Amino acid sequence: MVSYKEAGVNIEEGYKSVDLIKKHASKTFTKGVLNNLGSFAGMFELPKYKNPVLVSGTDGVGTKLDIAFRMKKYNTVGIDCVAMCVNDILCHGAKPLFFLDYIACGKLEAEVAAQLVEGVSNGCIQSECALIGGETAEMPGFYRDGEYDIAGFAVGIAEKDEIIDGSKIEDGDILIGIASSGPHSNGYSLIRKLVEDLHKDFAGDKIGNTLLAPTKIYVKPVMKLLEKYNIKGMAHVTGGGFYENIPRMFKDDFTAVINKKSYPIPNIFNHLMSLGVEENHMYNTFNMGIGFVLCVNEKDGENIIKDLIEMGEKGYKIGYVKKGDKSVELI
């Protein structure tokens, strides 16, 4: 007789991972959570809104995971997974409510799964949302031993008449960029071709550790700004860099004019460019040091930057909006 374990699925290791995961997930629970992990579904009670709209987003971490495999560091990519989802729904003014994750692997190692979910829980705490469920799939023969994939799904909420959709953006509005923590979770297929030795020294650390810096979560500072200012549009700078993402906030035909010298380019991007990538391709692939962009009235710009600094963020006036063709112009 052949057992499930002999086929490559270790149920006991699965039980162990669930127990380890529960202690991390419970730290994220907020008022709306109605049940513990282990049920068939997660339940969340909606807060009192006049005309609520649910806003959802899903994403993964991509080939940044390969850096984590090779560095044997597993507790940061969970933060990336949350960040990629909650920063997207934040662009429409939505407050994150809850999150679900999905982890797939060839051979389940409970301690590794627990480190992954520790990162997810950390990201949920940073974004003030609850981790209410997930799935860990052991798929022998499908993934190589030591490899895994992680993806997530976030749900947030906004008042219908407060949704940010770019419809109020005007000619002459300014663009404020909030600093990133590095490449975040995009461009890693290119990075892996450029950087072979992850243990090479870079700025006093191994370059592999620099490349694993988790994606910054912008929820707390941006939600505070939304309480004070008329923010007309927002963009999460992910795959495709400035060119792909900034125009996504425009409902009408505008062009974003970005001054490349308006903020300091982090050293990691200059290093990657020195390895043979053209500057224009850098801006079309990476966030280049700006992870989130706000479109606001010019009169509010100075105060917003001041508030960001007080909240521990770095904000810069990086450009302005003019009539155009849903494009980006770098100067």
Curated annotation (Swiss-Prot):
Annotated GO CC locations: cytosol
Pathway(s) the chain acts in: Purine metabolism; IMP biosynthesis via de novo pathway; 5-amino-1-(5-phospho-D-ribosyl)imidazole from N(2)-formyl-N(1)-(5-phospho-D-ribosyl)glycinamide: step 2/2
Localization: Cytoplasm
Short name of any one Pfam family annotated for the protein: AIRS_C
InterPro entries, per database record: PurM-like_C_dom, PurM-like_C_sf, PurM-like_N, PurM-like_N_sf, PurM_cligase
Keywords, ordered alphabetically: ATP-binding, Cytoplasm, Ligase, Nucleotide-binding, Purine biosynthesis
Enzyme Commission designation: 6.3.3.1
One of the record's GO molecular function terms: phosphoribosylformylglycinamidine cyclo-ligase activity
Main localisation: cytoplasm
Catalytic activity as recorded in UniProt: 2-formamido-N(1)-(5-O-phospho-beta-D-ribosyl)acetamidine + ATP = 5-amino-1-(5-phospho-beta-D-ribosyl)imidazole + ADP + phosphate + H(+)
Gene3D superfamilies membership: PurM-like C-terminal domain (3.90.650.10), PurM-like, N-terminal domain (3.30.1330.10)
SUPFAM superfamilies: PurM C-terminal domain-like, PurM N-terminal domain-like
GO biological process, one term: 'de novo' IMP biosynthetic process
NCBIfam families: purM
Family: Belongs to the AIR synthase family.
Protein name: Phosphoribosylformylglycinamidine cyclo-ligase
Organism: Clostridium botulinum (strain Loch Maree / Type A3)
Gene: purM
